[in-house]
Every structure is written in structure tokens, then in C-alpha cells.
Amino acid sequence: MSISLSESAAQRVSAFIANRGKGLGLRLGVRTSGCSGMAYVLEFVDDLNDGDTVFEDKGVKVIVDGKSLVYLDGTELDFVKEGLNEGFKFNNPNISGECGCGESFNV
């Protein structure tokens, strides 16, 4: 099982946590949503929950709950800039399709 970050994602998450002034890391999860079934969830973590798995890459801790891990195993979190837009991108080898708007996916 693994979750990784690109260098740009690790730098961005580290900066967010530093600006926030606290936090163990970043929670990566999935929830039921959208036309394809699942959507990604990103949020700061101050405390671990039972069943959480902690991955560390490039000095950043990524926390994943047990239910989400099966859908996220092998995912790389990237941070990309395209023109005036920038944001996190999920390179997930488990997805079989995405909705047209890019907000949700299925496995």
C-alpha cells in the first residue's frame, strides 16, 4: 500500500501547514458524490482516528482512513499550474472512469 506526493505537491502542502501553524498532515479520502460515484476529499489533520494509515513522503504525512485506502492505493498527489489555474491533481491508477466535469470518478 502506498500514497505518494510529487515535489510540487509536497512543497504546497508543507506551506499550507506552516501557514496554518499546526497540523499532523493532510487527510486524503473519498466520499460518495457526483455523477461517477466518488470524489476526493482533502483536509488538514490535527488528530488521528482509529483505522487511519499514515504515509510519509518528502517530509509530508498523508493520512488515509481504512475505507478510502482501497480506492487510493498507489495514488500520487500532484500540484499543477496550467495557465492561470492551479490545483491538486490525483494520479490514481485504480480509476476506471471520470465524469465529464472531472469532479468525480469510479473504480
Swiss-Prot record:
Signal peptide: none
Chain positions recorded as Fe cation binding sites: C35, C99, C101
Biological processes, Gene Ontology terms: iron-sulfur cluster assembly
GO MF, one example: iron ion binding
A Pfam family of this chain: Fe-S_biosyn
Coiled-coil annotated residue ranges, if any: none
InterPro entries on file: Fe-S_cluster_asmbl/transfer, FeS_biogenesis, FeS_cluster_insertion, FeS_cluster_insertion_CS, HesB-like_dom_sf, IscA_proteobacteria
KW Nucleotide-binding (keyword) present: no
Keyword annotations from UniProtKB, A to Z: Iron, Metal-binding
Keyword tRNA processing among record annotations: no
Cofactor binding notes: Binds 2 iron ions per dimer. The dimer may bind additional iron ions.
NCBIfam families cross-referenced by the UniProt entry: iron-sulfur cluster assembly accessory protein (TIGR00049), IscA (TIGR02011), PRK09502.1 (NF007049)
Function: Is able to transfer iron-sulfur clusters to apo-ferredoxin. Multiple cycles of [2Fe2S] cluster formation and transfer are observed, suggesting that IscA acts catalytically. Recruits intracellular free iron so as to provide iron for the assembly of transient iron-sulfur cluster in IscU in the presence of IscS, L-cysteine and the thioredoxin reductase system TrxA/TrxB.
Family recorded in the similarity comment: Belongs to the HesB/IscA family.
Name of the protein described by the UniProt record: Iron-binding protein IscA
Highest classification ranks of the organism: Bacteria, Pseudomonadati, Pseudomonadota, Gammaproteobacteria, Enterobacterales
